[in-house]
Amino acid sequence: MWRINRFVDGNGLDQESVRQSYEMAKSFRAEVIDVATLVELELDDVLCDFFVGSEFGFRERFKSHILSTEVCGLFQKWKILRSAVNTKSEWSTLAKAQKDTALIKELKSLISFRNSFAHDELVVDAKSAVCTLSYFEGERKTIKITKKIALSIIDEAKLVFQWVAGLHYAFEGEMEQRN
């Protein structure tokens, strides 16, 4: 068995199918984390629109002091946005016009998968060349990482990005109308 972050058992590691499964898992891990990062950066812009407006200096300070990943994670940013939008009637109207319950579920799913890929155990079984992600979500769970599943996660993440970017565009336009 080969664990992505550390060597456990070399038996079968030289088999081409194991190596391919390992490379596929690394590639999908990187892409899921990358697309989640893009969503997080877009959320940063939406939160800046809401809290500090368009002035560059304020935005940069807000991002570096409040929205930095050391202070505020992706899930916390989502909760802040959800709470903030509900407190401002015209933004709430815009958000509800854009709101799609399925996309919100996909955002939560993206956050969960991003955290699992980033922090939990990705294992390639040397005997079967099957890659699994072992993670904790209330209890220990595992999911087989196939190309189909990984591409589905990535496609959902891209839809979430487009949705958040749409919120950013709508909020940015609404801010310009107020100025």
Question: Predicted segments — roles?
Answer:
Residues 131-179:
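Amphipathic, Lys/Arg-enriched alpha-helical patches that create a basic surface
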Residues 66-99, 138-152:
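Short, glycine/alanine-rich amphipathic alpha-helical segment
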Residues 1-86, 101-112, 119-126, 158-179:
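Amphipathic alpha-helical interface elements
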